[in-house]
A protein has these predicted regions:
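Low-complexity intrinsically disordered segments
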Residues: 14-17, 77
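Intrinsic-disorder-associated, low-complexity terminal segments enriched in Asp/Asn/His/Tyr and depleted
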Residues: 8, 12, 19-22, 26-27
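Active-site anion-handling motifs in enzyme catalytic cores
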Residues: 25, 30-411
Length: 411
């Protein structure tokens, strides 16, 4: 009889949980989610945020600066794609309305009209998620201000989703815009604490949604040894932030030489952004050309975010400069060293490990050609310790990402 009662209680508990999940996802289906701004999936970190967000809130319209690029990586299969800015003929009624408003002193009239597809899509059931992650870290985001201002004027809830912001920029127009969001989801504690200090109240701390990105395991290329390959990612962005010219690539070259000379590990060069003006394949191709004759180095071609995560997850270590390459590794419990330059790398590592020391090497700090090598040697020495920490810590951390989706539907 006792066993029967226990079974009945278990069945009842499962039924209650199933019903709660049904209510949550049924509500999510009714939500009208507008995702903006999105520069295109050639930045696979941007793509990863979109894909992971749609695991939580499955129905959305993505307003993209490059819808054709998003189609190339398959986003049209999981969401509605719209161009963020619509062309405007000089013969159109929209143009002449904007022209008249401009002549009467509305200096934003033309810009606002170019983004009209977003404003026309929005209604009282809409949630507008600003998804760039670090859009407030690269100068004054004037077009984000403009879109936010108009959406708020229409009574639309605006959400800053999975963000990092350098503490020193929290002032003036940026701070005013941040204070006007319905809610802000900070993705790491440095940003969260800095915003709290500035009096921002509508604020939560959750992991970057991309920690929940699915992985797709393609056939590994020849030269990629599963479980015994060091993944390497280099970006033009970190090279721009180096203090001594050439120091970044010198450090990567020294690291590769060390791996080839002293270990039996292979090396996979993995791009994560392939935009023409910011293409990881350029520095990676440089490294590949130098070491391809060793037979120890493979250059991974461009793939979508889930496929890239599949390659990263089968590495033994990752040394990366792109945030979402590192997130792909963290979330699959790969010991990772980040060559970083900003708050996002430091903040995420601090939340995962308690501090960023040994896990993030600021590119600005590079002074010697073996700085990266020494940091990697520490990672090697502590490999077992890091993996043990992942096993106990990561399941709970990953679970928090879906809690962000649950909070979103209550706002």
């Amino acid at each position: 009889m006792l066993l029967v009662q226990q079974v009945d209680q278990a069945v009842h508990s499962v039924s209650v949980i199933s019903y709660i999940l049904y209510l949550f996802f049924n509500h999510c289906q009714k939500m009208k989610l507008l995702l903006y701004p999105h520069g295109g999936s050639g930045n696979h970190g941007c793509e990863a945020i979109v894909r992971s967000t749609l695991k939580m809130i499955p129905t959305a319209t993505l307003f993209s600066s490059n819808p054709d690029e998003d189609k190339r990586y398959g986003l049209d299969a999981i969401c509605t794609l719209r161009a963020a800015q619509a062309p405007m003929s000089h013969l159109s009624l929209a143009y002449w309305k904007a022209f008249i408003r401009y002549r009467f002193g509305d200096k934003e009239a033309f810009d606002r009209t170019s983004f009209r597809s977003i404003f026309q899509e929005a209604n009282s059931d809409s949630y507008a998620l600003s998804i760039g992650g670090d859009n407030y870290c690269y100068g004054v985001p004037v077009f984000i201000y403009l879109v936010n201002k108009q959406l708020r004027k229409q009574g639309i809830k605006t959400i800053l989703w999975g963000c990092s912001v350098e503490p020193e920029v929290l002032k003036g127009d940026i701070l005013n815009d941040l204070r006007s969001y319905t809610h802000i989801f900070a993705r790491e504690s440095i940003t969260y604490e800095a915003m709290k200090e500035k009096g921002i109240q509508q604020l939560s701390l959750f992991p970057d949604p991309a920690f929940q990105l699915n992985r797709t395991d393609l056939t590994l290329p020849e030269g990629f040894a599963e479980g015994n390959t060091v993944g390497i990612n280099v970006s033009p962005m970190i090279i721009k932030h180096e203090k001594a010219k050439g120091m970044t690539l010198l450090n990567y070259r020294q690291l590769i030489r060390y791996i080839i000379a002293t270990t039996d590990m292979q090396i996979a060069l993995i791009p994560h952004v392939v935009w023409n003006y910011n293409d990881d394949r350029i520095p990676l191709q440089f490294l590949y050309n130098e070491f391809k004759g060793t037979g120890r180095v493979v250059l991974i071609e461009d793939h979508n975010a889930e496929e890239l995560k599949g390659f990263i997850s089968r590495c033994r270590f990752l040394v990366a400069s792109r945030t979402h390459a590192s997130i792909a590794a963290y979330s699959t419990q790969i010991p990772t060293l980040v060559m970083g330059y900003s708050v996002k790398a430091r903040g995420i590592a601090r939340d995962l490990f308690g501090n960023e020391e040994h896990y993030v090497l600021p590119v600005q700090s590079l002074q010697q050609g073996n700085d990266l090598l020494k940091a990697f040697q520490w990672l090697q020495t502590h490999e077992d310790e890091i993996r043990k920490h992942y096993r106990t810590f990561m399941p709970g951390y990953l679970a928090k990402t879906f809690q962000a989706g649950q909070l979103l539907q209550t706002l």
